[in-house]
Structure formats: C-alpha cells, structure tokens
Regions:
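Conserved nucleotide-sugar donor-binding
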Residues: 2-3, 69-83
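Short, high-confidence coil segments that cap the C-terminus of an alpha-helix
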Residues: 3, 30-32, 111
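Short aromatic/hydrophobic "clamp" motif used to bind/position activated sugar donors
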Residues: 6
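The conserved acidic donor/metal-binding loop of glycosyltransferases
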Residues: 10-14
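Conserved donor NDP-sugar-binding/catalytic core segment of glycosyltransferases
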Residues: 17-46
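A recurrent flexible, glycine/aromatic-enriched loop bordering the glycosyltransferase active site
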Residues: 39-46, 56-75
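A short, conserved alpha-helix in the catalytic core of glycosyltransferases
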Residues: 79-83, 89-110
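Hydrophobic helical membrane-anchoring modules
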Residues: 103-166
C-alpha cells in the first residue's frame, strides 16, 4: 500500500458516511494515528444476550480501553507497518492485538487514538441466525478465560464455519 491512510473494513459492515468522514478527517488532520468505531448489529435487538448484551459490553470495553472492532479500523499507513500489522498467529481476535500495537506506536509517535461513538458502524448479525445464545456463550467463555485459544483454528470455528443443520 502506498496510501498515507489505511482503513480496514469487513465486507458485511455498513459505515455511515459521517463515520467514514470523521475517520478520514482525523487521519488527514495529522493528530490522530489510529482509531475505530462503536458498533451496532443490523438485526436481533430482541435477543438479550447476543443481540444486546454482547454488543453493549463490547462497546463499553472498546471505549474504555480503545480497542477496535475488526469491522472498522483506520490508521496511518506508516504506523501500521511500524507496528508489524495484523498478527499472523491468531485465527480470531487479531484486531485486539493490532489495536494494542497501533495504540503503542501511535503514542510513541505523538499521535492520538480515536474512538468514534456516533454514528456507529452497522455490523452483520448473521451468526445469530446460525447460533443460539447458549451456543455463543459456550464458544465465548473459553476464549475469554484462555486467550491462547485464539491461536487454535478449531477453537475459533465460530468465526469461520457455518454450522450444518441436522
């Protein structure tokens, strides 16, 4: 990449024009080195655990610790390359590792870290069609308690495999 700015976006994420503009303006302004945005799901607000609690908890964590959801990350290209980019050792959660590395290199270079709160990006809830709240909970708890599982492809099947119907 030869551009001065990089934006990483999931193919199934919708970015409101003003969110995109905030990211580009922040990077072009020179004070911000990297950032992300809060998110909402495009469906299933009635599912309390997976449709409301998990996205809300993620938004709180991402605001508090400035960790970026993989659905929308923006940064200065030189900072991305300086920090080594995405880790190739992780099958999931690589955006968390990248967030931490980008924050560190941004601050080292005197740049701010930005979290866009409004409007949030709209992320796909399609996995809620595939998994029940209980199934999601059974997949998430081991990953939270043992993050080394993020380096195990089988443990990260939730992000890659569509379950088969019996």
């Amino acid at each position: 990449a030869r551009a001065g700015n990089l934006i990483f976006l999931d193919a199934d994420t919708l970015v409101p024009p003003s969110t995109f503009a905030q990211a580009v303006e922040a990077l072009n302004g020179g004070e911000v080195g990297c950032g992300g945005a809060q998110l909402v799901l495009d469906a299933y607000p009635s599912r309390w655990f997976a449709g409301q609690f998990l996205p809300g908890a993620w938004n709180w964590i991402s605001r508090k610790f400035k960790l970026f959801a993989g659905s929308f990350i923006f940064c200065r290209a030189e900072l991305f390359f300086d920090c080594g980019g995405f880790p190739e050792t992780h099958f999931a959660g690589e955006e968390i590792v990248l967030s931490r590395k980008l924050k560190k290199v941004s601050r080292k270079n005197g740049k701010k870290v930005m979290m866009i709160s409004h409007p949030p990006v709209i992320s796909s809830a399609r996995k809620l069609d595939w998994y029940s709240d209980l199934a999601i909970l059974r997949l998430v708890i081991p990953l939270l308690g043992m993050p080394f599982f993020l380096r195990n492809q089988k443990a990260c099947r939730f992000w890659y495999d569509r379950p088969t119907k019996d």
